[in-house]
Amino acid sequence: MTYKDNKILEDKKKNIVLFYPYISKKSSKLLKNRLNTRWVGQGPMVDKFENEFSKKFLEKKKCIATGSGTDALHLAYLLAGIKKNDEVLVPVFTCTATNIPLLYIGAKIRFIDINPKTMNICVEDLKKKVSSKTKAIVCVHYGGNMCDMEEIVKIASKYKIKVIEDAAQALGGKYLKKKVGTISDFTAFSFQAIKHITTGDGGLLAFKNQRLYQKAKRLRWFGIDRKKKQLGVWENDVKEIGYKYQLTDLGASIGYQGLLDFKKILSHRIKINEIYLKNLSKNPNIICIHDHDRKK
């Protein structure tokens, strides 16, 4: 993608284009290379993508790339130990993708109201509804505006329950100088077309407990250790029911250059946000969402 004539918002006379997926010209070279190797499924390019993401956003902690952000959330819920009939607290304002994996499991979703100033989970309502029945809290950082993680983590610690962040819209975000993906038990990211970077479609799961890494990899691919299989080990010890949730090398090739160009991508989005805030704030009929001072 190129930003035509350095215009921040391209005027289409009738409509302003909502977004363009960021796909670097350099990605085509990586894609061509993958096609020439004929390694188009999950392979070394996915490993390279995960390593670069970990280095840039997760303080070098291990993570797993998935076929979608929804896949990443489903794995997070499973790794958090959520089972059928478990109560999970979720913000009422979110994409259906946050909740659908909970329905796969058969969990009981209990909605928490949102703070109208941020569109994020309302901590006061969370305090009213959390109980000994609660298994986990899911929070969504709407529009890159970080939730009040200090309070949410404090509540979760009191009840000894897990916190799962849906950070589909918050790549590169920080809370009290901590990067999103390093704060809670689990954090799910999305690389769908409209996100900060795209892999065509894809996602990624980060987790605090690094001992879950091997299990997460198995759950991502039929409950099998895929690396051992690739090395020619024909005995497959299937330890649990797994899924087919892996990212492909083709998707990773598209997204890898986006990781390298992330600073430029984020800067461009911030400029667009500033234009909207500056102009829409003048309209008394429109309420604009602003970042909290402690959040970035």
Regions found by a protein language model. Name each.
Residues 102, 156, 280-281:
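A generic structural signal for well-ordered alpha-helical segments
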Residues 93-99:
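Conserved coil-to-alpha-helix start sites within the AMP-binding
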